[in-house]
Amino acid sequence: MSKQALRVGIGGPVGSGKTALTLALCQALREQIDMAVVTNDIYTAEDAKFLVNHSALAPERIIGVETGGCPHTAIREDASINLEAIDRLQRAFPAVELILVESGGDNLAATFSPELSDLTIYVIDVAAGEKIPRKGGPGITKSDLLVINKIDLAPMVGASLEVMAHDAKVQRGERPFVFTNLKTGHGLETIIEFIREKGML
């Protein structure tokens, strides 16, 4: 019986940088860790195609799940299509150590079912406004790691990173958060360390 792969759920609103994070993690870790990806889109496999086109991993290691309807249902109430995709990847690649599960774009209330992910990373972006951490919601308060992406846009949207950091601390208590600019790779190393340490990879 092969060892269960570590499953890391990556959630967050549309356009926050989930696919950018998935791609960056694949590029940084694929030489060291045997990995695969499941993406969720409502009606297309757009994110999966993007990852394949950018050579994130070999195409057969990326499965695009079309959720239809509400994307949060596929990661929460009825995770069966995602669990099936994970099962397919584990059968095809018995040595796989890490499977990233990227949710469809969602609201702040979406969370991953515990049976679907061992660790959850929630991505929000500065461009959505500095009040986002304050608004809370399970993604912000309960995820294992909160990623506040696109910090380069803070001056353009008049967002204060200090205010965001303060609000994230208030909402999350001891749970960690990290500021990132995934275009430049700023903060990526912290996310990788977190996955390695918490996931014992």
Curated annotation (Swiss-Prot):
The keyword Nucleotide-binding applies. It comes from the Bacteria. GTP binds at G12, P13, V14, G15, S16, G17, K18, T19. It holds the Pfam family cobW. Coiled coil: none annotated. It is found in: Cytoplasm. Keywords: Chaperone, Cytoplasm, GTP-binding, Nickel insertion, Nucleotide-binding. One of its GO terms (molecular function) is nickel cation binding. The keyword rRNA processing does not apply. InterPro entries: CobW/HypB/UreG_nucleotide-bd (IPR003495), P-loop_NTPase (IPR027417), UreG (IPR004400). Homodimer. UreD, UreF and UreG form a complex that acts as a GTP-hydrolysis-dependent molecular chaperone, activating the urease apoprotein by helping to assemble the nickel containing metallocenter of UreC. The UreE protein probably delivers the nickel. Facilitates the functional incorporation of the urease nickel metallocenter. This process requires GTP hydrolysis, probably effectuated by UreG. This is Urease accessory protein UreG. The lineage of its organism: Bacteria, Pseudomonadati, Pseudomonadota, Betaproteobacteria, Rhodocyclales.
